Swiss-Prot record:
GO CC terms: cytosol
Region Leucine-zipper: start-end pairs: 111-139
CDD domains linked to this entry: RA_STE50, SAM_superfamily
Positions of the SAM domain: 11-73
GO MF annotation terms: protein serine/threonine kinase activator activity
Role, per record: Essential for mating and meiosis.
Species in which this protein is naturally found: Schizosaccharomyces pombe (strain 972 / ATCC 24843) (Fission yeast)
Record keywords, A-Z: Meiosis, Stress response
Protein name: Sexual differentiation protein ste4
Domain annotation Ras-associating: ranges: 176-264
Record InterPro entries: RA_dom (IPR000159), SAM (IPR001660), SAM/pointed_sf (IPR013761)
Induction and repression of expression: By nitrogen starvation.
GO terms (BP aspect): meiotic cell cycle; pheromone response MAPK cascade; signal transduction
Amino acid sequence: MGDSDDFYWNWNNEAVCNWIEQLGFPHKEAFEDYHILGKDIDLLSSNDLRDMGIESVGHRIDILSAIQSMKKQQKDKLQQENKDQELKNIEESYKKLEEKTEHLSDDNVSLEKRVEYLETENTKLVKTLNSLNSEFLQLLRKIAINVKEGRQLTTENSSDTSSMTHPVQPSPSVLGSFDLEVNDSLTNAEKNRKLNVNLTYNEVLCSMLQRYRIDPNTWMSYDLLINYDDKEHAIPMDVKPLQLFRNLQKRGKSPSFVLSRRSC
């Protein structure tokens, strides 16, 4: 019958003759002479077999019956193979689907972890921004308070300096220079409790220049002197002029400040 894996429509003449011989019919030569192929078997009729020289009606019926039985067996076999192949394809498709589902599940888990991480980082960022915002607002309040206090201090210092001075008078003690004498009264100094006696030499000098509308940037062109006992005295730059002024007042010296323009 030839290769058992081949179906009858693929048989050559030799395979057909071998199949007839295996059935036990003495008609192999007739099938050889007419060169019957597998694709011809399905078309044979009783008259065709008679024309091929098979006179026995019983043999013709048996051959046709064997052909139908063989066709049914191979058809069932083909259907089973198709079912097996379909089942195999379904199993492979299901396996691929499971793999894709597992992959998507892993991706979903990974995505959830990323979302959770981003939510955590976002929460941290919001807390950090809120903290920075709070610190920034506190800093702005401190700056506003410092600016306000600085303005008050400037006003108080100007008021203190003003309370210690009288209108500027020319000083005849320094010839060839532009001098300003600043008198102070003991009573006004004692009454003014806001007086800042810790101002440095340069601070007092610049304050005096500002008060009399002289550019403070020209302070190097002026000296701050103090007059007592009818004599002008130089004030060392490391001495705090207002403290010196107070000390002289306490000793009853009646001191006064003098602005003296240096000679070129």
